[in-house]
Amino acid sequence: MQYPEPIAKLIDSFMKLPGIGYKTATRLAFFTLDMEKDDVTEFAKALISAQRDLSFCSICGNITEDDPCDICQDPSRDQKAVLVVEDSKDVMSMEQMKEYHGLYHVLHGVLSPMDGKGPEDINIAALLTRLQKNEAIKEVIIATNATPEGEATAMYISRLVKPSGIKVTRLAHGLSVGSDIEYADQMTLYKAVEGRTEM
């Protein structure tokens, strides 16, 4: 049976989200149709507002309403350390821990030759430029996920940064192989930051 075009379009739209297959997208589409009109309107407004009002910080690449972001503008942050993460969700996870007080740099991905992602496809050049311009930075803490792509990205960044004399460290692996930072509990993250090792 074919669904009416508006439902089919809604299903297709939900399937564009990561991890959402046809069955889940269909369930979400019908759930949306059962929602109150006001709730659907608020949901649509929230999507449009997020797309319109958010951008990436020109310094660290984190998602923000203001440029530069609040973290980059905060003079109380430790200006000597930059924690390099894969995406903005990782920044949120680290901030919830409330134990790391340095700066961040968001890569927006990892090196993945299988997916055609090279160094030019992620935010590495901006990191190198930032390190050259800001002599206050003394340590780069690499916090990419414990996946083969995350490890390859960490090694690549380490090779580029080390010749500059800046200390390069890697989060300790209380994080199990294949795990994502955004899903780690706060104690695990705290121990990973505290136990970081030099690369």
Curated annotation (Swiss-Prot):
Disulfide bonds: none
NCBIfam families: recR
Organism: Pediococcus pentosaceus (strain ATCC 25745 / CCUG 21536 / LMG 10740 / 183-1w)
Domain Toprim, residue spans: 80-176
PROSITE patterns per the UniProt record, alphabetical: RECR, TOPRIM
Sample GO molecular function, one term: zinc ion binding
Underlying gene: recR
Record-given protein name: Recombination protein RecR
Keyword DNA repair: yes
Source taxon at top rank: Bacteria
ZnF (C4-type) residues: 57-72
InterPro entries: DNA_Rcmb_RecR (IPR000093), Rcmb_RecR (IPR023627), Rcmb_RecR_Znf (IPR015967), TOPRIM_dom (IPR006171), TOPRIM_RecR (IPR034137)
PANTHER family per UniProt: RECOMBINATION PROTEIN RECR
HAMAP family per UniProt: RecR
Functional description taken from the UniProt entry: May play a role in DNA repair. It seems to be involved in an RecBC-independent recombinational process of DNA repair. It may act with RecF and RecO.
An annotated GO BP: DNA repair
